[in-house]
Amino acid sequence: MKFGVVVFPGSNCDADCFHVLKNVFGRETVYIWHKEDNFDVDCIVLPGGFSYGDYLRAGAIARFSPVMKKVVEFANAGGLVIGICNGFQILLEAGLLPGAMLRNKSINFRCHDVYLRVENNNTPFTSKAHEGQVLKIPIAHGEGNYYCEPDTLKKLIANGQVVFRYCNSRGEVTEDANPNGSLYNIAGIINEKGNVLGMMPHPERCSENILGGEDGRVIWESIIAYLERGANRG
């Protein structure tokens, strides 16, 4: 089992993801530089940060980097891909997930803990959670206001592609619990095949008690369990 953490110019959460996978979970993990187009891993992590300075818009330039051609091929072949924060934005720009990110409704950068409700635990990324489980995970973004067309939203809901929604500590999905104005309180979605996840909150920042919480562990544990079953391809 081997994880690859992609490093773009401007990434700043790559080391966090690498640390959690390699040192907390003891899994073989390598960095993948944005210019690389030849690598062999079982799961690709697109980390948070400000790839290419977020010029034009978040993820717009990163999606044209050499590594993304390989990431798209990997995903289309059934490989697991998780995009966190800026990584989610890049997945949207690359067309691996539907929709787009807008500026936060408040126009402010938001950096604090939020609550997420697990809407679908029948995915490679949430199998160790239970449906309706509430997770406390931090966010740090200025463009996390997810948007898609009404027909796309209906399809996401019908297909179970909405994986996480912002909620309060009791698991109630409310407007007050939404930190950025995201449509339908969406915090994370998967593609139709179920092998590509994009989420705005940072599970790598709450996978050790020393950081104040471990709710993010369930996502990494789910991925590891899926890969251990040998079902990551096809």
UniProtKB/Swiss-Prot annotation:
Subunit structure: Part of the FGAM synthase complex composed of 1 PurL, 1 PurQ and 2 PurS subunits.
Classification via Gene3D superfamilies: 3.40.50.880
Reactions this protein catalyses: N(2)-formyl-N(1)-(5-phospho-beta-D-ribosyl)glycinamide + L-glutamine + ATP + H2O = 2-formamido-N(1)-(5-O-phospho-beta-D-ribosyl)acetamidine + L-glutamate + ADP + phosphate + H(+); L-glutamine + H2O = L-glutamate + NH4(+)
Matches recorded under CDD domains: GATase1_FGAR_AT
Active site per the UniProt annotation: 85 (nucleophile), 202, 204
EC number(s) reported in the record: 6.3.5.3, 3.5.1.2
UniProt name for this protein: Phosphoribosylformylglycinamidine synthase subunit PurQ
Main location, first listed in the record: cytoplasm
Localization, UniProt: Cytoplasm
Name of the encoding gene: purQ
Pathway: Purine metabolism; IMP biosynthesis via de novo pathway; 5-amino-1-(5-phospho-D-ribosyl)imidazole from N(2)-formyl-N(1)-(5-phospho-D-ribosyl)glycinamide: step 1/2
HAMAP family: PurQ
One BP term from GO: 'de novo' IMP biosynthetic process
